[in-house]
Each structure stands twice: as C-alpha cells, then as structure tokens.
C-alpha cells in the first residue's frame, strides 16, 4: 500500500441533540446528529404525535369546491 494517502483517523464522539454521546472513530473530529438510537421512536417504542389535523382541515377547505357537485336547478 502507498504511504501518506490515508486520511487521519481520530477517536471522536457522536453527539446527539438529546444529549447522548457515543464514542467511535472517524476521520472527523466531531460529529453532531439530530436523532440517535436513544431518542428515535423506532428504538424507544414511543411515538411522537404530529398535529396533522390542521393540515387536513386546510386541505379539505382548499379542495371542497372540487368535491361539491353542482346540481342543476330542476324546473317544475
């Protein structure tokens, strides 16, 4: 193998937004992530509730005119 072509390998810590720190090795000195296995809903079993009700209502209001079928006025 050629010498001097490999990147410098550091002992580093992955820091999550939840405060978890995971020691590892990398070519970067510091790694920051927004979500990790200690706070991800898949691994914790907890689900985050997303307020999608407002989005659904806004969608329905926007497209309700397409759902309404105009009925012609019947003459008697």
Curated annotation (Swiss-Prot):
MF annotations from Gene Ontology: metal ion binding; rRNA binding; structural constituent of ribosome
Keywords, ordered alphabetically: Metal-binding, Ribonucleoprotein, Ribosomal protein, RNA-binding, rRNA-binding, Zinc
UniProt-annotated binding residues for Zn(2+): 16, 18, 36, 39
Domain of life: Bacteria
InterPro entries documented for this protein: Ribosomal_bL28/bL31-like_sf (IPR034704), Ribosomal_bL31 (IPR002150), Ribosomal_bL31_A (IPR027491), Ribosomal_bL31_sf (IPR042105)
Cellular component annotations (GO), alphabetically ordered: ribonucleoprotein complex; ribosome
GO BP annotations listed: translation
Essential cofactor(s): Zn(2+)
UniProt subunit comment: Part of the 50S ribosomal subunit.
Function, as annotated: Binds the 23S rRNA.
Family: Belongs to the bacterial ribosomal protein bL31 family. Type A subfamily.
Protein name as annotated: Large ribosomal subunit protein bL31
Encoding gene, per UniProt annotation: rpmE
């Amino acid at each position: 193998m050629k010498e001097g072509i490999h990147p410098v390998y550091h002992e580093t810590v992955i820091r999550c937004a939840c405060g978890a720190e995971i020691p590892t090795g990398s070519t970067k000195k510091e790694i920051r992530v927004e979500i990790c296995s200690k706070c991800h809903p898949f691994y914790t079993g907890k689900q985050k509730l997303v307020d999608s009700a407002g989005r659904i209502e806004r969608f329905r209001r926007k497209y309700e005119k397409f759902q309404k079928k105009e009925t012609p006025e019947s003459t008697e």
